[in-house]
Amino acid sequence: KELKADNKPFDEAQIREKVRAEQKTEQSKFRDAAKTRATSESKQNTLQRITAAFGTTCGKIGILIAMACVIGRCMLASGAAERIVRAALSVVGVKGAPIAFCSSSFLLGIPVFFDSLFLLAIPLVKATWLKIKKNYVLFVVALVAGGTMTHSLVPPTPGPLFVAEELGVNLGTMILAGMAIGLFCSASGLAYAYWINKRMDIPLRESPEEMKKLEELAERDINELPSLGLALLPILLPVALISGVTIYKSGLDPTITIHPALNLLGDKNIALTLAAALAMLLAASRLKDRKLLAEHVQQAMMEGGLIILICCAGGAFGAMLQQSGIGPHISSMMGSEPLDFTLLPLAFVVTAVIRGAQGSATVAMFTAVAIVGSLVTDLEALSFHPVFLAVAIGCGSKPFPWMNDSGFWVISKMSGMTEKETLKALTPMATIMGLTGIIVTMIAAKLFS
């Protein structure tokens, strides 16, 4: 036992008092340091601080987002994305179509942004409905359950990518943790899809002309599409390279230097660039006119440029929040005890509130990581890995989607459901998935701390 100056042991009350005093001292140091930094930075030119934060964010995620846009666009153009969905359907059959839609959208949600993914897959959902004339709500909700989770938990989509960079989480670690926890979330969403399908009988609302197109799509020869192996390659290659090197490094003695070539291939920018090159080659092999490839890549870059600008603006906004001293203010409201495990539910709630208020899951994640990140002076001092904090923020971006969310309208209009039907089918499912995610995240953080 620890001894006092008179060589007598402390009693339990004295030990608790000593620990409490040390915690208050650490918390005071954090607040003083944050206030000092905010005061120092406030003396600098405001525009310089904004542009510096903007540029730093662009340097972290600019190439990744651009390459992800190229991968997604080229996979759509080449038919690779459709091939993956059809392969899943062929394995499980029409009876297992909900599982096929959920699993394939979960996988495609890694490189393809959710809106594009939904626009691609909803015709296949409708074509499948034509074969059995039932379970339309089940198919639509299952499709959303898969793609929406990887959109918020697995890089290189902007939200989880930005959160991982801000919290200093290795990209491979974020991919592995996001996919693992995302599986539980999507499973809960799929369970809700089966439940709500029994309570909502919605027919397919399409014109005769559209019905004819859907019938043609359902009868499309699979040989017109790329092979499954080639279709999966642009997705699996970066995941394997980035995650593989991360796992390999974690098992090495810290004194051992990894081979430069392996380190290079496992670099996130290199891995995504290689995947983009493969996706472009695949699209070039399927498109009759090479000029079409240039148009698709140009369109991808235009989309990527807009997303990069939004992300960098979010990074600058986050930096301004941190420099405002909001962290110490929130910390003081939470009491004198240093925040640790309570950061996980706090991050979830903060993100969920912001998501419900303004609609965008990505913007909610950008804002929340700035607020929550300002509460922590040393991420390594946490009792759990920072990846769980990143995942908690991602899960918090799921609850309460409604009419202020662009994704809500994409799902509503493209599926043919009314606003009331979409609210009934979508909002509870997304909320359940978010709650499932934070529960699993907290359990995992305890188990692996």
Predicted regions mapped to residue ranges:
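Alpha-helical transmembrane segments of multi-pass membrane proteins
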Residues: 94-109, 132-152, 172-179, 183, ...
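Hydrophobic core segments of alpha-helical transmembrane domains in multi-pass membrane transport
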Residues: 1, 19, 65-72, 104-108, ...
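Hydrophobic alpha-helical transmembrane segments of multi-pass integral membrane proteins
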Residues: 62-68, 91-124, 311-314, 337-375, ...
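Juxtamembrane and boundary regions of transmembrane helices in multi-pass small-molecule transporters
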Residues: 132-134, 173-218, 395-449
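Hydrophobic transmembrane alpha-helices of multi-pass solute/ion transporters
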Residues: 1-67, 83-91, 241-313, 329-337
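Juxtamembrane helix-boundary/capping and inter-helix hinge elements in multi-pass membrane proteins
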Residues: 41, 76-81, 91-95, 128-138, ...
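Long, contiguous bundles of hydrophobic transmembrane helices that form the permeation core
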Residues: 176-296, 449
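Re-entrant/interfacial helical elements at transmembrane boundaries that shape
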Residues: 69-70, 83-86, 116-128, 157-167, ...
